[in-house]
């Protein structure tokens, strides 16, 4: 949504990354850990109390979010009523939006000065990497068009899954479904020796993010997850072959 808003109004969209985000969270519960190997302490201690969250702790993500939320609200932002990860601030008729997803932060707004001030405020509290203009976020590439539009695609992800499932050198086809073939469930005692479930899951992730054009094809093959046969695997590979020729397709 924030990408669409930024493009609609012609606002800049910048990206920041919080360095070791989870380590900023202050623990509110009593949590103890074993003394790390190689750490020498005065006294006979069997464990240590965690003051701050650490990676791998089940509370870490929640504590980090509470820490970020508390600080952003302290500098004048309000949490959106529609998205708890979106923060809004209005100053003298100008607004700035901050969206956080774990440790990725997107900032846009009607005033470059207000955006710069917000960045400065955030950097005084958290160590952050400023990537400037957002071009790649959460595995999605943002490609600007000459008319001011933006296309969101997952070319890198497509390359990754093609290689993962041994389809990186396959021949491209123009459609994700072979309409001349009708697939039916099977009651065979054996399944096809192929990573069918993993492949369909990978395609579902792509479908829900930026590739609605493969929704029918993925939904079709997902009907046969319980007992996939060779013809079902061929249908999955057909989708991969379609992706081979449409890597830059996405949401416009």
Region locations from a protein language model:
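Long, low-complexity, charge-biased intrinsically disordered regions
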Residues: 1-252
């Amino acid at each position: 949504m924030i990408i669409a808003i930024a493009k609609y109004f012609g606002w800049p969209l910048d990206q920041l990354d919080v360095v070791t985000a989870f380590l900023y969270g202050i623990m509110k519960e009593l949590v103890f850990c074993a003394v790390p190997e190689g750490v020498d302490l005065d006294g006979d201690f069997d464990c240590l109390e965690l003051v701050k969250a650490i990676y791998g702790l089940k509370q870490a993500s929640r504590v980090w979010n509470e820490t970020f939320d508390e600080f952003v609200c302290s500098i004048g932002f309000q949490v959106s009523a529609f998205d708890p990860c979106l923060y809004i601030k209005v100053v003298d008729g100008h607004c700035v939006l901050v969206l956080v997803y774990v440790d990725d932060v997107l900032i846009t707004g009607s005033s470059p000065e207000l955006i710069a001030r917000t960045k400065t405020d955030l950097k005084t509290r958290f160590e952050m990497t400023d990537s400037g203009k957002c071009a790649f976020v959460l595995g999605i590439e943002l490609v600007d068009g000459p008319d001011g539009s933006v296309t969101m695609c997952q070319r890198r992800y497509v390359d990754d899954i093609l290689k993962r499932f041994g389809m990186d050198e396959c021949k491209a086809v123009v459609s994700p479904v072979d309409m001349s073939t009708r697939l039916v469930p099977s009651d065979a005692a054996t399944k096809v020796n192929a990573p069918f479930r993993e492949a369909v899951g990978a395609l579902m992730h792509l479908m829900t993010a930026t590739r609605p054009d493969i929704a029918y094809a993925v939904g079709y093959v997902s009907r046969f997850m319980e007992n996939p046969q060779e013809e079902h695997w061929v249908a999955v590979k057909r989708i991969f072959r379609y992706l081979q020729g449409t890597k830059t397709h996405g949401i416009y």
